[in-house]
């Protein structure tokens, strides 16, 4: 287990360990799962080695949950409706209470973006395919959904708020 891969030296050691059959778990700072490929390449790792050392990519964010004690249905603002879609007219928002220390939030929920590195993705990585191509394949063939899509669904379900969605998917 590697705590965090921040530089080329750590990335190289991790890739060599993975190539020789060791399961290596590490973290990278990226906006989404597929961007990990670019990040490793930026650290000087050859595309062929990236393709053959990865088995999966996971992006994870924690979203604060609306407090179940003070959460109330409220009308969306025009800005929120632009973000959420015209079909959404109400959302759940905490008003603040003793259970949530006045924040309107209590607890967190994990949102994941998962990509399995299969034979086709290995080929794409090896030939230096654009991230958009790999992402499109993961969506179409693996059913991958982005952090933003999953977060949006949680807002629609009343689990969290548009502010939390913007916080975890600021780049989208």
Question: Where do the model's predicted regions map?
Answer:
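Short, flexible helix-loop junctions that flank or precede catalytic/ligand sites
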Residues: 1-172
């Amino acid at each position: 287990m590697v705590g965090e891969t921040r530089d080329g030296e750590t990335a190289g050691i991790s890739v060599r360990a993975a190539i020789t059959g060791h399961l290596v778990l590490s973290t990278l700072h990226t906006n989404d799962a597929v961007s990990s490929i670019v990040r490793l390449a930026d650290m000087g790792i050859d595309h062929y080695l990236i393709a053959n050392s990865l088995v999966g990519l996971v992006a994870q964010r924690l979203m604060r949950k609306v407090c179940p004690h003070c959460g109330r249905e409220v009308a969306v603002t025009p800005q929120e409706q632009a973000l959420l879609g015209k079909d959404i007219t109400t959302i759940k928002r905490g008003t603040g209470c003793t259970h949530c220390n006045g924040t309107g939030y209590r607890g967190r929920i994990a949102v994941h973006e998962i990509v399995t590195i299969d034979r086709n993705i290995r080929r794409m990585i090896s030939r230096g395919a654009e991230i958009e191509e790999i992402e499109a394949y993961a969506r179409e063939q693996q059913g991958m959904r982005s952090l933003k899509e999953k977060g949006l669904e949680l807002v629609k379900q009343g689990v969290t708020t548009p502010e939390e969605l913007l916080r975890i998917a600021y780049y989208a």
